[in-house]
């Protein structure tokens, strides 16, 4: 992690990429790491900014302004995991690691979502691992924020994404001091986070809460496998919206429909906040897309590499009748 590991005093900083033996618990040590289907299949001149430490996700997006360059990622990426995410290391192949992200449910692996990431994006940090489940936590509510070595924010560090969750070490009226994997403690602006006490369950959101959160992403460019404020895909978008409000649903659209245990809903009974699903063909069971229902035949979605997060008519989106059903997440009234 850089700049200069968020320069400060205190503990020795663990080295990213060290000690990554199979079976080890590690944590993501960059803004967001992108999981690949296979290692070393990236385009160096395009995807390089997403593979360094620190990552440069804005620069990565800038290399993919045209549709075909962005669409190339389809089927080559698995998911993303933001700073502080817990992972299990399964395999090491040179400077790549096969991991599972424990917070992202999938029918593919009961432990979490699998994929390959650069070893430099991971750190074995025992101090962070001990604090994560027992400390108050700061969840980033801003789309992006910046970790700083000083409470004043005048010593910038690295960017952090929406829904990044880090252990709290202390706080003032203007800043929250957090533990950072693979780095010394750093500060986030208090206005950019919400703090929950250890063991505290966030209040159950209403449909309006979830929709309001989703509306903040309108205009964000689609990114296959994305779950961060630097780009989302359809199910990464819905997963992140509910996860931010303390509700766990599976990572992929098909699993959200078939394996998350959510209540089935008939089309005539749709309510705001329901998840609506679309199949690869009319009447099919293979799910290709999910969107958030807004009422009045409107959906909010991350559609494809050609577009950005948007609101549009459900009927207009589905002229060929690929609507496959809906599920309802339990929400507050």
Task: Show which residues each predicted segment covers.
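Short, well-ordered loop/turn sites that connect or cap secondary structure elements
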Residues: 75, 81, 160, 269-270
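Aromatic- and glycine-rich peptidoglycan recognition patches
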Residues: 153, 194, 227, 254, ...
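Short alpha-helix capping/helix-loop boundary micro-motifs
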Residues: 70-76, 146-156, 258-266
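Catalytic cores of extracellular degradative/oxidative enzymes
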Residues: 268, 280-285
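Catalytic cysteine-centered active-site loop
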Residues: 222-235, 240-272
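Loop/turn positions that initiate beta-strands
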Residues: 84, 157, 161-166, 273
């Amino acid at each position: 992690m850089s700049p200069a590991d968020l320069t400060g005093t205190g503990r020795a900083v663990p080295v990213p990429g060290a000690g990554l033996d199979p079976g080890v618990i590690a944590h993501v040590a960059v803004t967001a790491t992108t999981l690949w289907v296979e290692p070393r299949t990236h385009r160096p001149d395009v995807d390089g900014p997403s593979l360094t430490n620190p990552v440069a996700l804005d620069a990565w997006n800038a290399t993919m302004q045209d549709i075909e360059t962005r669409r190339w990622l389809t089927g080559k990426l698995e998911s993303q995991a933001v700073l502080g995410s817990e992972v299990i290391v399964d395999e090491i192949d040179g400077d790549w690691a096969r991991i599972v992200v424990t917070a992202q449910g999938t029918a593919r692996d009961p432990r979490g979502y699998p994929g390959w990431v650069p070893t430099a994006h991971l750190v074995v940090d025992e101090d962070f691992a001990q604090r994560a489940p027992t400390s108050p936590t700061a969840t980033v509510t801003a789309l992006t924020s910046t970790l700083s070595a000083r409470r004043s924010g005048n010593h910038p560090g690295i960017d952090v994404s929406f829904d990044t969750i880090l252990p709290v070490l202390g706080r003032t009226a203007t800043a929250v001091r957090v533990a950072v994997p693979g780095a010394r403690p750093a500060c986030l602006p208090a206005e950019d986070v919400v703090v929950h006490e250890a063991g505290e369950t966030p209040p159950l959101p209403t449909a309006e809460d979830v929709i309001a959160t989703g509306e903040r992403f309108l205009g964000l460019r689609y990114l296959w496998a994305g779950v961060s404020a630097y780009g989302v895909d359809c199910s990464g978008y819905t997963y992140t919206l509910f996860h931010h409000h303390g509700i766990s649903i599976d990572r992929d659209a098909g699993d959200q429909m078939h394996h998350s245990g959510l209540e089935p809903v008939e089309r005539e009974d749709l309510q705001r906040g329901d998840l609506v699903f679309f199949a690869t063909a009319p009447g099919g069971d293979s799910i290709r897309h999910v969107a958030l229902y807004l009422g009045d035949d409107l959906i909010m979605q991350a559609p494809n590499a050609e577009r950005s997060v948007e609101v549009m008519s459900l009927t207009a989106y589905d002229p060929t009748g690929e609507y496959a059903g809906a599920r309802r997440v339990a929400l507050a009234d």
